Swiss-Prot record:
HAMAP family: nitrobindin. It comes from Nocardia farcinica (strain IFM 10152). A motif (GXWXGXG) lies at residues 85-91. Coiled coil: none annotated. This is Ferric nitrobindin-like protein. InterPro entries: Calycin, Nb(III)_bact/plant, Nitrobindin, THAP4-like_heme-bd. Residues 1-59 are annotated as: Disordered. It holds the Pfam family THAP4_heme-bd. Belongs to the nitrobindin family.
Length: 235
């Protein structure tokens, strides 16, 4: 387990703290359950009627990023249900060549009723003045849920535009937080050289999706690489 998995008691809150720079001691008082439900209903007024575009005339079930629309979610994917949607926001990155930087990001998590979730993430650099600074990272893949004895195993298969293919395995730490680590990293002939990684995702205060990625750099220890807090745009 990474250090992220040993700090504090709530993995989702830890992901949020790493993504916005707040210390654990700065946490606000917890809201009541009724207030959380009311806030979620208010957010759904803006996001609940949206969905991703789908090209017509295919005999297949349509992809949907909105659990209110399209095919029912497969029971096999209930452990990942809170992730379904489109998420947009900003984060902070650290690259050995570039140093610290800000980025914008959109993540699309959709399904077609099958026993997997589709995943697409695109990010872009944000300049010091807040302007667009060019494309950054792009990845696409699938989430699956396997079984190891009596335990569920979260699987994440990713292909990166940088020429990397990764297989992550992990677990659901709570009903709304998940931790994964790479089991295999494959580089194409033209791909960049990277080490293994760990990721922690969580649904945090306000219904946002927060995450932290740590990655091995130059055969060294795990180091913070990416963190972001994204707001729901669809779903």
């Amino acid at each position: 387990m990474s250090d992220l998995a040993s700090e504090g008691s709530d993995p989702a809150e830890r992901a949020s703290e790493h993504s916005n720079g707040n210390a654990p001691a700065d946490r606000p008082a917890r809201r009541s359950g009724d207030q959380a439900v009311a806030d979620a209903a208010e957010r759904a007024k803006a996001t609940g009627s949206r969905n991703i575009p789908v090209l017509p005339d295919l005999p297949l079930p349509e992809d949907t990023a909105n659990l209110r629309l399209g095919p029912d979610l497969s029971p096999a994917m209930l452990a990942l249900l809170p992730m379904v949607g489109v998420w947009r926001g900003e984060g902070e990155g650290n690259d050995p060549a570039r140093g610290d930087y800000r980025f914008g990001q959109q993540i699309i998590v959709s399904h077609d009723g099958g026993d997997y979730l589709s995943w697409e993430s695109r990010s872009w650099f944000i300049e010091a003045d807040g302007s667009y600074g060019g494309p950054d990272l792009r990845e696409t893949g699938f989430w699956r849920v396997g079984v190891d004895g009596d335990d569920e195993v979260i699987e994440l298969l990713l292909t990166h535009s940088s020429g990397i293919v990764e297989l992550f395995y992990g677990t659901a730490l709570t009903q709304s937080s998940w931790e994964l680590a790479t089991d295999v990293v494959i580089r194409s002939q033209s791909g960049v050289v990277v080490g293994g990684a760990k990721r922690l995702y969580g649904i945090v205060e306000g219904g946002d999706l927060a995450y932290v990625e740590e990655r091995v750099v130059a055969d060294g220890p795990l180091e913070p690489r990416l963190s972001a807090r994204l707001q729901r745009y669809i779903g």
